[in-house]
């Protein structure tokens, strides 16, 4: 890796660390901007993934028990693509192992929605990994002939992709997808190994950022997926502001907000607000 690239990565880490915990989502957007500027990615998607099934049940599941808990895209995707993703990967279980959760993995159209890449990603769970669409980690010639590739790549003009997966724990992973779109004319410029190495260095060294991001969105075993309101309340709590002030800013009754705070504490397995805040300091 070139010395100039290393210095850019160091500066990015400093910039990410400068964001307070309450502005972790802004740090995510900043990181996505960086990938777009320095690696010419047309879109960046962040996924929080959670292992929901025990070992025995996971053996019979096409995703080996892993489920998408949260998904954020840097650019607004086509409505048809958003509906396609939601039709299969929506987090309707909200942390509960409902019948719909189990049926999802056994639906007749599972192979259409769960492509070769996704299956390989979950098979390798537990290690930091980086892959390019055409670097040989999957049989690309076979992959591009699948219905999954047509629906999820060709119809959405995704010409190339990098997968970067950070294992925060044995049951939680932070996943970044960097996409390049098919240009209007000419051939697409595929990601190089050097570009993938730069992206990997950025994310492999940002351990604290991954953990803050995952916690903010409730991507932890036993924690239900947080609603948008709960996420905003949590962001307010992380600023250190009084609950009354947070309630006013969110248009909530203080007593109602107090109930939300208690619920958040319970979901994160703590009993007080200071203990909840300590999670972001690595003290719990």
What residue ranges belong to the model's regions?
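Regulatory input/activation interfaces that engage signals or partners
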Residues: 4, 11-21, 29-172, 178-183, ...
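Amphipathic alpha-helical "output/dimerization" segments
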Residues: 187-208
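A cross-family signal for key residues in well-ordered alpha-helices
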Residues: 200, 235, 248, 278
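Regulatory hinge/linker segments at domain boundaries
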Residues: 211-232
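Short alpha-helical "packing" element that flanks the helix-turn-helix/winged-helix DNA-binding module
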Residues: 230-237, 276
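Short helix-capping/turn signature of helix-turn-helix
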Residues: 237-241, 282
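Recognition helix of helix-turn-helix DNA-binding domains
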Residues: 240-275
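Intrinsically disordered, low-complexity basic tails/linkers immediately adjacent to helix-turn-helix/homeobox/MYB/SANT
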Residues: 277-284
């Amino acid at each position: 890796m070139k010395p100039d690239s290393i210095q850019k990565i160091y500066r990015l880490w400093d910039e990410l660390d400068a964001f307070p915990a309450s502005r972790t989502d802004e740090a995510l957007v900043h990181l996505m901007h960086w990938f777009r500027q320095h690696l010419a990615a047309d879109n960046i998607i962040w996924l929080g993934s959670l292992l929901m099934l025990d070992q025995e049940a996971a053996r019979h599941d096409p995703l080996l028990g892993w489920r998408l808990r949260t998904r954020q895209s840097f650019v607004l995707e086509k409505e048809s693509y958003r509906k396609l993703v939601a039709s299969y990967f929506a987090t309707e279980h909200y942390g509960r192992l409902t019948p719909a959760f189990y049926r999802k993995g056994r639906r007749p159209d599972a192979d259409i929605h769960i492509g070769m890449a996704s299956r390989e990603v979950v098979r390798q769970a537990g290690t930091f990994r980086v892959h390019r669409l055409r670097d040989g980690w999957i049989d690309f010639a076979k992959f591009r002939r699948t219905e999954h590739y047509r629906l999820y790549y060709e119809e959405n003009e995704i010409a190339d992709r990098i997968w970067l997966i950070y294992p925060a724990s044995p049951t939680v992973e932070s996943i970044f997808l960097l996409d390049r779109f098919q240009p209007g004319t000419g051939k697409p410029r595929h990601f190089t190994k050097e570009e993938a190495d730069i992206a990997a260095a950025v994310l492999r060294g940002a351990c604290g950022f991954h953990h803050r991001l995952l916690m903010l969105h409730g991507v932890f075993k036993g924690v239900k997926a947080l609603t948008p309101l709960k996420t905003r309340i949590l962001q307010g709590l992380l600023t250190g502001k009084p609950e009354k002030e947070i309630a006013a800013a969110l248009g909530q009754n203080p007593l109602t907000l107090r109930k939300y705070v208690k619920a958040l504490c319970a979901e994160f397995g703590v009993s007080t607000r200071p203990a909840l805040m300590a999670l972001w300091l690595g003290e719990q």
